[in-house]
From Swiss-Prot:
Pathway: Carbohydrate biosynthesis; gluconeogenesis. Belongs to the phosphoenolpyruvate carboxykinase [GTP] family. One of its GO terms (cellular component) is cytosol. GTP binds at residues 273-278, 389, 420, 515-518. The keyword Manganese applies. Binds 1 Mn(2+) ion per subunit. It comes from Corynebacterium glutamicum (strain ATCC 13032 / DSM 20300 / JCM 1318 / BCRC 11384 / CCUG 27702 / LMG 3730 / NBRC 12168 / NCIMB 10025 / NRRL B-2784 / 534). The lineage of its organism: Bacteria, Bacillati, Actinomycetota, Actinomycetes, Mycobacteriales. Its EC number is 4.1.1.32. This is Phosphoenolpyruvate carboxykinase [GTP].
Length: 610
């Protein structure tokens, strides 16, 4: 195989990996790009791409004094979020995808997508993006190569992964890698003018678990196009994890340091809109306690001799912007202060800064909104899209834990599950053991609110382990992997806790202040692990007593805290039928241990409700 066989290659290929070169050559024949470029991951390359995208109208350079080396992108209004209805797990057998995923036969899907891929990069450059999941120092790293026609994706991948020549060197002449194909689906004919945000109305985001391939078409946005993120780090990695005996989870990783300098590490899984990023970057309100962030979104967990260790496979934060401010998440705001940030679909101020709903201070008198239109506080529409994003490197965070670059990871002391429940679920509860905790995670749910247009208010939206859109195989087998890990780890496994920051009183007010004060709950979790405090026995487990929480300096009335810690049996009884139906929906591969734990929960509810 010679590099001459890769039509349009700019310069010599910086690799001797024949498998990689053959794959690229085949892709070139399918996509028909004008040029092929191996990216090196350098700052000079990033700057050059940014300049080109500013000229093309895709990026707007922000005020250099306020946001150094930072840019704003505005996507097409049809391309603003993950599209779960167009996301497929194409396992050989439909039952292996399970009831929570869209399925299509793999060869039929490849045939269909190949029709769309044919010639889809005409007039564009195909970028070869080698990347490493997790620290590049890992002696046995998980690697990938994404072929893409989107410079925005290349720029995002440089922030979100360890990308470029170092990753290519890790792949070497004979190394294996996950193959990721991506095209925005907007070919350019000779002389045709490009648009600022190329995409296609037809979209596919497809994972092939047996062959560890990812094919994406039609979208340039976020997790649809930055294939190292949800597609690899969760959907494909969860399949690898089951096969190899580890776990790929939708979890933050937090380092908590007590006044004596002892560090603890917590992993936590929350569905969307439940405060995950804010907890990952928490600023404790308890004197003497500090926190550092290892990761805000994804954890890969592996057993070692003395316990369960977590690594963050990502290199950056891809956070939701609206609602982020110096009160709710000062660390996120400070992380963006030095610049080097890629913003998408936020508003633009008249002096070249960015703005979104929920930012500190009053809204400016005039903005350009995320669609490029004039906006004033009297406008009916939001200035920033609700799913607008900031993309920034972790090592720029003032609270970045140095261990985020340690390939061996950090030993996890506790795992938290939490949804958004106005009632039923107490503020914090320790589960009885790993199997009980697995059942609690399997039934994780958030109550629907009036804000959910299609939902019946009060019904539960189930999201097992906050992994519902990201389990790359049968959900019952995914739960079996949890049980298997617990059996292997035994008493070395971390304790599992259930938390709920969102309990409301009868008048609708929140009973718990949340945000930085959630450190008080984390302190109780640590105290519980260390055996320093007792607990009340409730239907769901060992629930905290109000007097055991450190409430010094908290304005919240003690009566509210006590109410937030209740687990009313009649409310739990109301959930039983819904939860039973959901376990049935998950199918016959749900482990017997989960069913027996649910039976035990029902028995406790009946006894308390009698």
């Amino acid at each position: 195989m010679t590099t001459a066989a890769i039509r349009g290659l700019q310069g010599e290929a910086p690799t001797k990996n024949k498998e990689l070169l053959n794959w690229i050559a085949d892709a070139v024949e399918l996509f028909q790009p004008e040029a092929v470029v191996f990216v090196d991951g350098s700052q000079a390359e990033w700057d050059r791409m940014a300049e080109d995208l500013v000229e093309a109208g895709t990026l707007i350079k922000l005020n250099e004094e306020k946001r150094p080396n930072s840019y704003l992108a505005r996507s097409n209004p049809s391309d603003v979020a993950r599209v779960e209805s167009r996301t497929f797990i194409c396992s050989e057998k439909e039952e292996d995808a399970g009831p929570t995923n869209n399925w299509a036969p793999p060869q039929a899907m490849k045939d269909e997508m190949s029709k769309h891929y044919a010639g889809s990069m005409k007039g564009r450059t195909m970028y070869v993006v080698p990347f490493c999941m997790g620290p590049i120092s890992d002696p046995d790293p998980k690697l990938g190569v994404q072929l893409t026609d989107s410079e925005y994706v290349v720029m995002s991948m440089r922030i979100m992964t360890r990308m470029g020549i170092e990753a290519l060197d890790k792949i070497g002449a004979n190394g294996s890698f996950v193959r990721c194909l991506h095209s925005v689906g907007a070919p350019l004919e000779p002389g045709q003018e490009d648009v600022a945000w190329p995409c296609n109305d037809t979209k596919y985001i497809t994972q092939f678990p047996e062959t560890k391939e990812i094919w994406s078409y039609g979208s340039g946005y976020g997790g649809n196009a930055i294939l190292a993120k949800k597609c690899y780090a969760l959907r494909i990695a969860s399949v690898m994890a089951r096969e190899e005996g580890w776990m790929a989870e939708h979890m933050l990783i937090l380092k908590l340091i007590n006044p004596e300098g002892k560090a603890y590490h917590i992993a936590a899984a929350f569905p969307s809109a439940c405060g995950k990023t804010n907890l990952a970057m928490i600023t404790p309100t308890i004197p003497g306690w500090t926190a550092q962030v290892v990761g805000d979104d994804i954890a890969w967990l592996k057993l070692r001799e003395d316990g369960l260790y977590a690594v963050n496979p990502e290199n950056g934060f891809f956070g939701v912007a609206p609602g982020t401010n110096y009160a709710s998440n000062p660390i996120a705001m400070k992380t963006m202060e030095p610049g080097n940030t890629l913003f998408t679909n936020v508003a633009l101020t008249d002096d070249g800064d960015i703005w979104w709903e929920g930012m500190d201070g009053d809204a400016p008198a005039h903005l350009i909104d995320w669609m490029g239109n004039d906006w004033t506080p009297e406008s009916d529409e939001n200035a920033a899209h609700p799913n607008s994003r900031y993309c920034v490197a972790i090592d720029q965070s003032p609270a970045a834990a140095p261990e985020f670059n340690d390939w061996e990871g950090v030993k996890i002391d506790a795992i938290l599950f939490g949804g958004r429940r106005a009632d039923t679920v107490p503020l914090v509860t320790q589960t009885y053991d790993w199997e009980h905790g697995t059942m609690v995670g399997a039934l994780l749910a958030s109550g629907q609110t009036a804000a959910s247009a299609e939902a019946k208010v009060g019904t539960l939206r189930h999201d097992p382990m906050a992994m519902l859109p990201f389990i790359g195989y049968n959900a019952g087998e995914y739960l079996q992997n949890w049980i298997d890990m617990g059996n292997k780890g035994g008493d070395k496994m971390p304790s599992i806790f259930l938390v709920n920051w969102f309990r409301r009183g009868e008048d609708g007010r929140f009973l718990w202040p949340g945000f930085g004060d959630n450190s008080r709950v984390l302190k109780w979790v640590i105290d519980r692990i260390e055996g320093h405090v007792g607990a009340d026995e409730t239907v769901v487990g060992h629930t905290a007593k109000a007097e055991d929480l450190d409430l010094d300096g908290l304005d919240t009335p003690i009566e509210d805290v006590k109410e937030a810690l209740t687990a009313p049996a009649e409310q739990w009884a109301n959930d039983v039928e819904d939860n039973a139906e959901y376990l049935t929906f998950l199918g016959p591969r749900v482990p017997a241990e989960v069913h027996s734990q649910f039976d035990a929960l029902k028995a406790r509810i009946s006894a308390a409700h009698a």
